[in-house]
């Protein structure tokens, strides 16, 4: 249930939009399986497979972006095209031109697509209307771009903004490595990546290794900066922070797992409990993370404008 990756975006806090309205916006873009000749397709799917495109509890919403893609290796297409081209050349007595080869390749692709394997992938989106977060559970930037693209297409004038904090995450992570500790209930774990900003970009990675202060100081004095840092929040959630503020490898720790509702009687009740627990914990963690990075610049601008 827990998101593994957090691509963060800001919404107005609070964002006064009801789940029913989101449902209406998403409905025209609901996922429809592709036909036999479509290479890929995408749309919104039901988080609970009950037909509803929005799952909502306590001003928290879950959406599911579904993408379907046919697997047709280029090597297979090229192999069949080459064989077909040889047959045609034997019949007509001369080699095919570039345009004819391109048209033949397109024809072969159309013939093979209906027999290609299909893969389907779901990507979850969490909307916190109370605190103004929109979070995409995607590790790859390209996948996040696809989800954002459909969100913007589905929701007219979506008030989506990037997260802007006062402190550079790279500078902050580098300082925390140098001091060996992070502020505000966060701790530094044993995975880190330091990279030189100079030509060549020399990189040092630590995985499951004690981050000794002398070693960190030596690398930082040599011009390297921290670009990935494993951390833990409040002994409850571990994660890896990146320069873009994308959070990866999110893992709830035992204290949270033990907080799961033992009275849940069925899948629906367990799902509701899990969503409430996850969104509550991650919401508090994100608030604390923004605080230790100097605060949200959007909030500062809004307060200045109001004054």
From Swiss-Prot:
Location(s) in or outside the cell: Cytoplasm, Nucleoid
Please tell me one Gene Ontology term that the record gives under cellular component.
bacterial nucleoid
Among InterPro entries, the record links this protein to:
RdgC
Q: Which keywords annotate this record?
A: Cytoplasm, DNA recombination
The principal location of this protein is: cytoplasm
Gene Ontology biological process: DNA recombination; regulation of DNA recombination
Cytoplasm among the record's keywords?
yes
Q: Which molecular-function annotation in GO is an example for this chain?
A: double-stranded DNA binding
In its keyword annotation, does this UniProt entry include Chloroplast? Answer: no
Alphabetized Pfam families for the sequence: RdgC
Role played: May be involved in recombination.
> According to its UniProt record, which protein family does this protein belong to?
Belongs to the RdgC family.
**Protein's UniProt name:** Recombination-associated protein RdgC
């Amino acid at each position: 249930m827990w998101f593994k990756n957090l691509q963060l975006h800001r919404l107005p806090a609070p964002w006064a939009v009801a789940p029913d309205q989101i449902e209406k916006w998403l409905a025209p873009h609901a996922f429809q399986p592709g036909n036999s000749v479509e290479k890929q397709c995408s749309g919104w799917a039901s988080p609970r497979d009950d037909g509803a495109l929005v799952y909502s509890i306590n001003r928290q919403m879950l959406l599911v972006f579904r993408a379907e893609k046919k697997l047709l290796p280029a090597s297979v297409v090229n192999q069949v095209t080459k064989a077909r081209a040889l047959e045609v050349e034997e019949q007509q007595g001369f080699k095919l031109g570039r345009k004819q080869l391109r048209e033949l390749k397109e024809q072969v692709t159309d013939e093979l697509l209906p027999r290609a394997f299909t893969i389907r992938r779901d990507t979850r989106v969490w909307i916190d209307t109370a605190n103004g977060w929109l979070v995409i559970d995607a590790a790859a930037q390209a996948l996040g771009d696809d989800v954002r693209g459909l969100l913007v297409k589905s929701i007219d004038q979506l008030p989506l903004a990037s997260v802007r904090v006062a402190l550079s995450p790279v500078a902050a992570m580098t300082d925390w490595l140098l001091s060996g500790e992070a502020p505000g209930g966060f701790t530094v774990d044993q995975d880190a990546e330091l990279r030189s900003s100079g030509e060549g970009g020399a990189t040092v990675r630590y995985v499951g290794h004690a981050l000794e202060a002398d070693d960190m100081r030596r690398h930082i004095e040599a011009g390297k900066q921290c670009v990935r840092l494993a951390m833990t929040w409040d002994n409850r959630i571990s994660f890896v922070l990146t320069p873009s503020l994308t959070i990866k490898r999110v893992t709830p720790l035992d204290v949270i797992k033990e907080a799961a509702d033992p009275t849940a009687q069925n899948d629906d009740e367990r799902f509701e409990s899990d969503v409430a627990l996850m969104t509550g914990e991650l919401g508090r963690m994100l608030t604390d993370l923004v605080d230790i990075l100097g605060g949200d610049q959007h909030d500062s601008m809004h307060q200045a404008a109001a004054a």
